[in-house]
């Protein structure tokens, strides 16, 4: 029984790794077609937000989304639940 549990956990780990890689690839595809200023904007937004809240670099996401005729700048900030500063 212990051996079966061990093998099952490896499958879950592999599935998790696969899902993470798919997310990274999708994000890279989104950034490839965007303007050159988006990465700089993301870093600057992170610096400003860090003045008020303690967050990781991965907490700020900036994407440019095409919505018909318009380009929409989508900014997502994952704030900590405890209001840490």
Curated annotation (Swiss-Prot):
Name of this chain's protein: Cell division topological specificity factor
Protein source organism: Xanthomonas oryzae pv. oryzae (strain KACC10331 / KXO85)
Keywords: Cell cycle, Cell division
HAMAP family linked: MinE
InterPro entries linked to this entry: MinE, MinE_sf
Main function: Prevents the cell division inhibition by proteins MinC and MinD at internal division sites while permitting inhibition at polar sites. This ensures cell division at the proper site by restricting the formation of a division septum at the midpoint of the long axis of the cell.
Stored Pfam families: MinE
Gene Ontology terms describing biological process: cell division; regulation of division septum assembly
Family under the similarity heading: Belongs to the MinE family.
């Amino acid at each position: 029984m212990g051996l079966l549990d061990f093998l099952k956990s490896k499958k879950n780990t592999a599935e998790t790794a696969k899902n993470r890689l798919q997310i990274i690839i999708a994000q890279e595809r989104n950034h490839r077609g965007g303007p050159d200023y988006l990465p700089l904007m993301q870093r600057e937004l992170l610096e400003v937000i860090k003045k008020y809240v303690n967050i990781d670099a991965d907490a700020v996401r900036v994407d440019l989304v095409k919505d018909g005729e318009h380009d929409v700048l989508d900014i997502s900030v994952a704030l900590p639940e405890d209001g840490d500063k």
